[in-house]
Every structure is written in structure tokens, then in C-alpha cells.
């Protein structure tokens, strides 16, 4: 059935009109908890029968995308969550007294479950897309419609017209994304994506420098005497006990290393790590590295023989014959390269805002350190020139020899070591075509422009068709988290482009408002699964069995069951389920793990434990490039040369093959490439003089928890502005202001603080967009202001690169 005809059919079963809850509806109560660990040694801390008060203990975990994975001990009475408490079972033999305690967001989980924003029933759209008007329908009708749409779109346009959007709202193993991908692969495949909104630039650029993406765990800082962090803010982005911040602090307690944090904001990490703050202009990190390199070279502070042993392209002696004679990084820094500009500390100071004397001093400090741990967060790479920032920071430890030795890193952000919990098998996607995840709106609006050499399409020379059937599950990137939301609204509102949008969600998010079919899935406190520690658990890794702490309310369902029903309408239920329920898949995964780790308890015991097992990475696993440093020939990197490639011939070739927009470059060296929207663009800054960068607030994880008002009371969303800039605009803290540029206007309070560099403003990302009658985003979403124009190499999101003006509302 065509989508328009289906939307206009009369429903005979429960055909009440369901008005959407207003975005950001109030939740008025709060409940604080603290959370630790459970292990196999503490199996006695399993849920027990009801106590004298009729309360039962159940176990779950916070599954959002903060990088941690914190266990939640949920107290239930009469099938209702009454509070969340610390999980007090632990084994000091593994991590000492360390307990994985959730942050204030995880502690507010029950308010998400009982939020007035919850989607209760399957619904179809009535009225225009984005109006938020829906009609309740049955599950049978909803799943039958999806099955019919999969068939219709496949027959009319081909499977490339079916797209499953990037999402990170819930990291399940046997439902959520794996369940949907299993269904789509089973039914013929779908248009895939590559990269993520978090790491597009660093994930794309790193292979050209290092090959594989690896980094030393923060435990290595126990052996360091100096720590230099570019835009890394663990105290806010990884603030729970399940994250890396605990590891960092313990390592610093051991080493007493000096910490330098380079960031436009004086972050909480500067405070908690007792660090020196070097405020820097956004987008200019590569210029800082070049200025440091100039001092290293001219003051003979580096060992050139060592650099040439492990690197390609530092000087002319290691350049390939295909490169120009003066194409080395040393030529670039000293001004004997093509641009003829010496990258002196004075040159770098004019760009970065860091005084030349401090740049020289920093170079000397890094060069003289016994073991310097150099690391970058993901914020610096989320810029229009992010790939160059990534490669420049990776070059710094290569130049100074601070890699592959205890207490060092290679410049990368270190992923955690996973425990190894399997995912639901998804099968193989017959469709090999993949697009950069940030360019799905282009694949809807202008598919004819989506080619391998213009838009980074992989697996094919170009797209054959636009996206016609769109799945958006547990994610808000359909609107809220995507750049330039006003542009996105216009594309989604045009029903002649993407014909059907299916949203699977817990809450009526801004993205959910644009659904044609809206399906309610279980929250993680209503779900069951076996899950892994997440990507930012550091050297800690563990496994958690999560239970249905309460019965799924209303008509919400597991995505595994939803997909099984869709498969059933297509005659594929048995192939989809293989005769197993979701719980049986989790049990099977556990048995697979237990075969390798026979000390684990029986599943009947383990599934009641919460945290079942916990492990810690070895010293060898925690140190990046150790084998390479010991013997580069015997243990080469996975780059073409087997070495650290400061000059990348692969990038030089790509720059020749690709067609780039005017003014954009893909250099073979980690050069500083000015961003269009930076303080260096005098034409734009005459109109919009402030650089605006986003940051991860403690009040919500991306857009998850953004509708829990008690968190806003604890951590309000405010735009940070320096007193100098505030005084020029006659602003004081608490004033409601308009932050604006050509892409839109956002209204929110301002915070006047010396913790932000003059000329720079900062706004937390993740607030739910909500336009008033004048088109002003009174929800406070930074993406009303951010650009959709992608970065040159990764075609990634440049959402921290913006120019704006601020005035009183």
C-alpha cells in the first residue's frame, strides 16, 4: 500500500487520536543513587524474594552513548520502580575498592521510564510531517505495513533505497540495532553507512598515519612525568565510575605527573586533574603543533635519526620518489615547502592565541620529558579541518619519541578493551554501497550528486537511487543531532523525496515528530539482554546481565519481537528467530563465553547477578606501539610503508582523484588548513565575530536525558561567553540571549565566565530543538546553528566549527 493511502485509511481498532507530548515535558521529582560492581565472587548478591516491605531487587544498566556502561540496581514494588540504589556486591581482588557508579544521568533513569514523553502505542501520522499528530493503530497493522513497504520499495527502487540511520541511544546486544540489521539483511539488504557522528574525522584520518586505530590506556600515565591533552575532558564526557576518568585519576595519583590541557574552555578536567590550562582558538591545533615542531627542529630538541627510523616524510631522506623534493614536514615547518612560510611560534601564536613564548616552552617541556603521554579527545576532530588536527597531534609523539614506551601514547584517544559479549548475528548485507553517515540528507535530496569522488561513497561509483524508506531507531540524528536543523526540516517535510519514515523510540523526541509510522520500544529498564562494557571503560571490562526490572508498560515491545513479527509477515519468521526468543539468544551468547571461561557460573545464576564478571587488560594490551618501537621491521604498522606516515602518499593520490569544493584541500602532510568559519575569515567575522563550539554537558548524554528537567536544574544548558565579549554586548549571567547566524536563531540563557577564551562561545549539545512562532529555537539546540557542509576527507560532521553573534533576547 502506498504510504499516503495508508496514512489516510480509517482505523477501526482503538482509533483514538493521540496528541503528542510536548518536547521537554516536566518531570518534577528526583532520586539520587550510587552504583558499584558485582562479580562472580559475589553471587550471593542476587535478587532475593520480596523483603518485608514487598520490595524486590532487579538488575539493569544504563545503555546510553556516554562510553561507559554502568550497572543499575533497581528496587521494584508492585511492578513499579521505587528507587535505584548502589549495587553493593564487588570483588576487591580485581579493581581494589573501585566501584562502577553511575553519574547523575544514570541515577535519573526511572524518570525516563515514567516520563510523560513516553510513546505508549504504535501510531501512524495524521496531518503533515513534523506536526506531531498521530493516530493509534494495532501492532499487527504496523508490522504488516513495514513488511509491505520493504517489498514495495525494494521492487520499485531497489534495496539501495532502504536506509537504517546512525543511532546511539541504546547499546543493546540482542535487540535494537542488531535486530533491525538482521531483518534488513535477511530481506535483501540496505544502503549502509560508514563513520559515526562522534569520530568520523579521527577514524578516517588515523589509518593514513598509523594504520590501525590504537592508543595507550590511561593506566600508562602511572609511568608518565608529563601529560598533554588536546581537548580531552574526561571529567565531563566520561564522568561515571564505568569510564576512563577513574583510571586517569588513579594513574595520576601514582605518577604525580604534570598535566597540561589545551582547550578553548577551562573544563572541569582542568580542575579535577590540577592541570595547567592553555586556551586555544578552535580549529587551530595543527598550527600549534607546527609551531612546536619549529622549536624542536631549530633548537635541535629531537632525534632525527630516531624519527626517520620510525616515520616516513619527516625530512627529505624518507620521502617517496613520487613526492616533490620539498614536500617533507620539516620543509613545511621551516618554510622551505611550497607555501614558503616558516611555522615559527610567532606565526602559530597569531593563529592559536597562545603566546609564542609559551609555545616554545611547551616544545621544550615535551622534548625534555622522560615519558610524555600525548592524547587527543574527540572534540578537536569534530571540526571542518578535523582530519588535519588529528594527524598533527599524532605527529607530535612521533617527533619527540614519546610512543611505544611505558608512560607514553601515540596521540590517539584510547578505546576500552571489550569483554567480548557477542551480538545477535546480523548476517551479510548483499548491498555493498555505503555513504558517510553525515550525508544521508544529501542521499535523500540529491542522490545524483552522491559519488565516490565527490561525497565519499564506498562500494560503488555512485548511488543508483535516493533514500525512499528510512528507519530511525533509538537515535535523534533524524533531526536534533544533525547539522543545520532548519535545512533538515525542509528535506524531511518534502514527502516526494523520502517516501516513508519509520521511527522506533521511547520518547516523543524532535526526530519522532517526523515519523510516518511511530513504534514504541522498551526502555532498558523494561528490557533483558547480556551486554558488554562500552568503548570508554578503559582497561576495565565486564559483562552485565540486564533484567526486565518491570513489565513493559502500555504496548511497548522489544525490537527483537517487532522484527520477528515483520519477518513473519514476509514468511521469514523461522529464518529470523532460528527458533529462539530474545532471552534464549542471550543465554546462548553466555554459554559461548562460558566455554572459554569455565569459571563463570551457570546461566540460571548469572542472569540474576547484574555484573557477572570483570577483567582488566594486561600491561602489554595497555601500551600502544610497544612491539613496533622494540623492532619496527619485525612489527610493522599496517600503513603502506609499515611506519608512521607523516607524509601520506595515499592522501596525495586521493587529493588528485577527488573533486573537492573550492577552497578545500586534502594535504599529504598534517598541515594547518584554515577553516572557512574561523576567526581568520575577516569577511565573515565582520558579521559573526564569535567562534561557537559545542561540548558534552553533564546534564544529558547527547540528547538522551535532555527531557529530564531535574537534570536541567542541576546542570542548565547555557551558552558560555567571556566577560570581555559579554560587556561589549551588555550581558550578564542569566540573561536570555539570541545566538544566531545565517542558519538560524537559538534562545537560551548565557553564562558569563572567564572559563572561555575571548572571541569564543560554547554551547552544550543535545538540547531538544523546539521552534516558536517566529522560528526561534527556544529549545536551545546548537544544531540550529551548525553547518551541514562536511569535512574534506571523512565527509564528517564539522559541528564545532561555527561563527555566530550573540545579543540580548
Task: Describe each region flagged by the PLM.
Residues 2-5, 177-262, 287, 395-514, ...:
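Extended redox/cofactor-interaction regions of prokaryotic respiratory oxidoreductases
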Residues 2-301, 473, 727, 771-809:
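N-terminal export/assembly segments and adjacent metallocofactor-ligating motifs
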Residues 143-162, 217-227, 339-340, 360-373, ...:
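Glycine-rich phosphate/diphosphate-binding loops that line cofactor/substrate pockets in enzymes
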Residues 165-172, 347-351, 377-384, 415-417, ...:
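Conserved short loop/turn motifs at secondary-structure junctions
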Residues 265-369:
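Long, well-ordered, tryptophan-enriched scaffold segments
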Residues 309-312, 366, 410-420, 579-592:
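A glycine-rich phosphate-binding loop feature that marks nucleotide/adenosyl-phosphate handling sites
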Residues 525-552, 562, 567-569:
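Glycine/threonine-rich phosphate-binding loop and adjacent beta-strand/alpha-helix elements that clamp
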Residues 549, 555-609, 701-705, 709-720, ...:
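Long, contiguous, secondary-structure-rich segments that constitute the structural scaffold
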